[in-house]
Amino acid sequence: MPRLLTKRGCWITLAAAPFLLFLAAWGADKLWPLPLHEVNPARVVVAQDGTPLWRFADADGIWRYPVTIEDVSPRYLEALINYEDRWFWKHPGVNPFSVARAAWQDLTSGRVISGGSTLTMQVARLLDPHPKTFGGKIRQLWRALQLEWHLSKREILTLYLNRAPFGGTLQGIGAASWAYLGKSPANLSYSEAAMLAVLPQAPSRLRPDRWPERAEAARNKVLERMAVQGVWSREQVKESREEPIWLAPRQMPQLAPLFSRMMLGKSKSDKITTTLDAGLQRRLEELAQNWKGRLPPRSSLAMIVVDHTDMRVRGWVGSVDLNDDSRFGHVDMVNSIRSPGSVLKPFVYGLALDEGLIHPASLLQDVPRRTGDYRPGNFDSGFHGPISMSEALVRSLNLPAVQVLEAYGPKRFAAKLRNVGLPLYLPNGAAPNLSLILGGAGAKLEDMAAAYTAFARHGKAGKLRLQPDDPLLERPLMSSGAAWIIRRIMADEAQPLPDSALPRVAPLAWKTGTSYGYRDAWAIGVNARYVIGIWTGRPDGTPVVGQFGFASAVPLLNQVNNILLSRSANLPEDPRPNSVTRGVICWPGGQSLPEGDGNCRRRLATWLLDGSQPPTLLLPEQEGINGIRFPIWLDENGKRVAADCPQARQEMINVWPLPLEPWLPASERRAVRLPPASTSCPPYGHDAQLPLQLTGVRDGAIIKRLPGAAEATLPLQSSGGAGERWWFLNGEPLTERGRNVTLHLTDKGDYQLLVMDDVGQIATVKFVMQ
């Protein structure tokens, strides 16, 4: 009976052994899980073609370039598996024959001389380093079995491809291929594949950059094995043995540092693939370095290039020199908030075209104005009087842009831009106002470049794509016709040429901007394929006297444009939209008039949007007789009379806006354009038979303040003339509209006072204050 029980117990033990073994393995697996996940892994940012841009090492300073099996040349995989572990795809993580051989060699020698390690076991050692002892070997075997339990063969091989040591701080075939050879691991030759396959066996001793002879000998050993096993032909091996150990200049990836830093926060991936073009990025950074010597002290620059056909960002230079602290090289000016100056002007003109407020030849008024406490001026401190919208945009005049924004509405304008991804940054609690159009709000260069794509994307502004998988998103900003017209104006081709004469290749359309106090210089350009954004200035916001967009940013814009043209074929110009037609309009009314019509004082050819001919846009205060078109009554002699005079007949007359009178030839002023008044039945309120005169100070007078007085008080009177008075002191409008005005002068210097009445008569006087 005891013998029977013993035999039965043995059978029970044998039957239970697999279960107990499985239970023990399961428990050990739970107690000592595989260390697959790193807390702070190495990361790399790469260009769209896979070229590494910038590496971010892990806590141990290790650099990796993550790859998949598909990213690696089949030649390397053949060399690796056939040299290191021929039975990799079949064994369970441990090759019993190799282990037995290694164990016998180790036992007979009394020390570990042969590892017998499979690729799975090598991965186990990489994940969980251990001493080269028998206990360490058992631990390695256990980890290998764990790997095979939890992962597929492809996953284990992928771990090896990314964790194998290749010398120094390099881990993985991706990092090694780029660091040693300057190429993708997908493009390895037979010779290169063999060299890199053997390198992890002794990465310090076989480093090709330090020991090329050793690396060549090890490579040849692998090549011979490939020939013996029939993996590669003898001819291929022979040619590969003759290939010298060639290495690219050893350097870590150093492109787009600020862009790469930004991308770390946008992706959790160990390898962040971006839309940047590595070749273009390198050219842009070389250009920035060459440009550094032209910049004033403590100044920097920023550049962005966007392919407007698909909204991919192709180049991004955030500063002139990352390592130059005096120029705040660590500050990315592409996504910093700065005052854009006049760069917003094309948007307000395009939106006003769609709104039917203006057309390209609309008469605008570049004259002194004051709106409350806001008194804008032009960059050149002068005024140009009557000017078309096209000319105002080309010359970047401020007063016409303010006039159009006032009609469109600053709050509405800011909301429209915000809706398409161009937020304007205002001080806390501030509301959008007329200063927006002259740089009175902050903006980012990246947002500005994205918004400018509307001029190349049929009026739709796209969202920048930083990674290839980012969706293509866009929102309408203006109509296709308005975008086409504004782009032509920015290319300085506002004249409505015949279609046959339009350029076949899209020219560079561009706009500059200069912020208040010369703190920022901008230039944004749109060519056939790209939008180029340029900024120069001091990151700390201090002024750079003499820096403005045309002088500081446009030369850099042209250099970038030349680089782009040399790299890609020119794309054809977009055809003229059907909504855009040619027309001829008249000034001052702004609309077409028949030939010979006396109200057409000047004819201008222009593009028209949807055939619309908006009348001349007036300032808010220009109504009634101060406007452009109003009725007059004439007697049988052609003289002006009151409406209720006998035999009075009505006619409509177009005159120029009153503020433009000082810039008009005498024949175009109201005093000449309006027929003389009848003395027998004059128009109501008219005493223009008396010339307009100015009294209170004689021409050439010298004015002095009374002793102890802070100012000189100068009462002035006007007589004659008709209607209200318009007063200008040194070209600046005064708020008074009456016949008399009192000046309070505090500054010494030359003065010119001008008064104008409702019919355009002018009286002037010059004097000096001492």
Swiss-Prot record:
Disruption phenotype: Deletion results in an altered mode of murein synthesis. Pathway: Cell wall biogenesis; peptidoglycan biosynthesis. It comes from the Bacteria. Residues 1-8 are cytoplasmic. Its main location: membrane. GO terms for cellular component: membrane; outer membrane-bounded periplasmic space; plasma membrane. It is found in: Cell inner membrane. The keyword Chaperone does not apply. It is an enzyme of class 2 (transferase). Residues 30-770 are periplasmic. It is a single-pass type II membrane protein. Transglycosylase activity can be inhibited by moenomycin. Its EC number is 2.4.99.28. Keywords: Carboxypeptidase, Cell inner membrane, Cell membrane, Cell shape, Cell wall biogenesis/degradation, Glycosyltransferase, Hydrolase, Membrane, Multifunctional enzyme, Peptidoglycan synthesis, Protease, Signal-anchor, Transferase, Transmembrane, Transmembrane helix. It holds the Pfam family Transgly. Cell wall formation. The enzyme has a penicillin-insensitive transglycosylase N-terminal domain (formation of linear glycan strands) and a transpeptidase C-terminal domain which may not be functional. Due to the fact that PBP-1c can neither substitute for PBP-1a or PBP-1b, nor rescue a PBP-1a/PBP-1b double mutant, it is possible that PBP-1c has its own distinct function. Moreover it does not bind to most of the beta-lactams known to bind to other binding proteins, suggesting that the penicillin-binding domain must be different from those present in PBP-1a and PBP-1b. It may function as a transglycosylase only. This is Penicillin-binding protein 1C. The lineage of its organism: Bacteria, Pseudomonadati, Pseudomonadota, Gammaproteobacteria, Enterobacterales.
